Amino acid sequence: MLAAAAAARRHWQGRQRCVVLDTDFQQGQSFIQLWRAFREDREDREDRQDRNDLENDKNAARCERLHVVAMLPTALKQEDLICTARPADDAPYGELLVNAWPNLTPGFHSLSFDEDSVQLLLCNGPVGRQLSELVARVDVFFVHGHLLSDSALADPSRLAKALAKVFARLAAEGAVVIAKDEAASVAGDVALALRKALSDQGFVIEPNTADVTNTSTNNNTITARFVPRFQPKRAPARLHAQLSSARHAVIVGAGLAGSSAAWALAVQGWTSTVFERHSSAAQEGSGNAGGIFHGVIHAQDGLHARFNRAASIEAAKAVRHAIAHDGVAGAADGLLRLETELSPFAMQAVLEGCSLTPNYAKAISAAEASKLSGLRLKHAAWHYAEGGWVEPAGLVRSYLARAGSRSTLRTNSVVTSLQRSDGGWQLLNAEGDLLEEAEVVVLANADDAARLLSTLAPQALAALQQVRGQLSQMPSHTPGLPNSHLPLTGAGYLLPSWKGQTLFGATSNEGDTDSAVRLRDHANNLAQLAKLTQIPAVAELTSNGFQGRTAWRCVAPDRLPVIGGVPLKTQALIDQPRLMARYPGLFVYTALGSRGITWSALGGQTLAAWVTGSPSPIEACLLDAVDPARFTARRVRGLQRNQASGKVAAV
């Protein structure tokens, strides 16, 4: 890995960001060497800066961010990392890595070190599948020779062609590929196949490995640089160009979406200005007294389940930080979701079929669920180990606090309209006065985003719905009111008692515009709570001492958020979201529905990747699933089906 570290060091000189892809994380040795080299380089530059030694150095600007994308063919447990022997100089890095190690589930996992200057994206699963789902612009590729020489894998020639094709898709300008086998030479048919495949995809082999006919060489390293004969065609939605020379974004909305976007952009080194129409942040859907977060388990493990799983893992980290550092009310030590159809045995089979470990979720009996909750439950349950609850407004404040000086909140600022300008985008108030002009704008203002886009992209958010919800709150000592040790959900939800109050709910009424807290909705919430806890008498409790709150959820028909670049109003009949052209510098992050707490952290990170060009924290198929262009793509596919059947429909 020293060769890759040296190549990366050369590549990150004078750059804002360097992205390294490692085809096998192993026990983290390669990552730690890169991390150590990056930190030492930064410290050396700071020392030289203090001595004014960098005055004439054209690469004086230090690299701000090192991104390492590492394939993890086999899930690695924390104890495996602990037992890994490391040189003394690497031990401190190993300890930090162990402490940050996630409970691995299939898919991508993001870790951050050294005040976000070193970011690690772990891709857990078969290498070929994970590479095909990766969205990034890679500067340095490190290929472990055993990936090609392992006889258990496919034919080396076929695999080399597949790898080279993926590398060409991911390669940034001037990217370098380094293939090295630590145990033996990358030679013979394997070397020949890899060199030829790379050459065919626009990589130029370095002179020391240029002889593709000499299979007897003892050189065990192949080095190639990406110099394509023609510019490869990129999917417009995946261009990931930095559109702001100032690396600054204007965000409209200071709820869970807007605040998490500000935090995630700050992690990538960007600044932001957040416009909020109210006098403070989190005054609408994010202003409830409490809410839950957890994953989703489906036997098919489809896009909805996978996105929710990835999001819940990031949510747990965000909530723990908010509790520990910002004094926010909440807990991330478990949640119970009742299962009324499957037996614990069948539930366990689902978990095993999805390769999910107890660290993520367990199937437990009614007796076990009763013990954990303190209630007499009659159904089995999914125990989400990292699920929990939190005060949403507190989480919003935590996101903004983490963005720190990189983000400015402007309250009592109502954005009435949005228009294009030579400088990018102009935000105007009701009088037509200019509030701000920016190259990058993020609309994170729930359904109001659709209004701002009504002229630019009238169909982009037309499918969004407004759903009224009312939650109920009662004194915890109310006779007959159940109290649970853990958050309980299923038909409705029940939060643990907090400061003498118990929160439960909630109603769901599409198209209801009444803002009043209604007694009949309290009654509905009690009936729902009675069904959840299987205590019929709960439904008969009186409304004395009731408190409540109404808010509106912005919901997409497919019950997934909307995150990404805004598609152009008019374009060809394209049926794939990733191929649709976008308005430059205009993004949307909305439709968090009732899962704002669960989705906000990962949603913010996904939005930041769109804006800044950093590696996407989720797979390409999940990007498609939350892409604003998905609604247009579906209409196009519907039109194509109608045309095929002789019908006519409008897009």
Predicted regions and their residues:
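C-terminal substrate-binding/active-site "lid" region of AdoMet-derived donor-dependent transferases
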Residues: 151-228
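Short beta-strand to alpha-helix junction loop
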Residues: 178-180, 300-311, 340-344, 382-401, ...
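Active-site substrate-recognition segment that forms the wall
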Residues: 230-244, 250-252, 256-268, 277-278, ...
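Dinucleotide-binding Rossmann-like beta1-alpha1 core, especially the glycine-rich loop
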Residues: 291-372
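Helix-loop-beta segment of a Rossmann-like dinucleotide-binding subdomain
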Residues: 299-302, 327-337, 360, 366-401, ...
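Helical element adjacent to the flavin cofactor pocket in flavoenzyme catalytic cores
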Residues: 382-431, 435-436, 444, 448-450
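C-terminal catalytic lobe of FAD-dependent flavoproteins
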Residues: 538-651
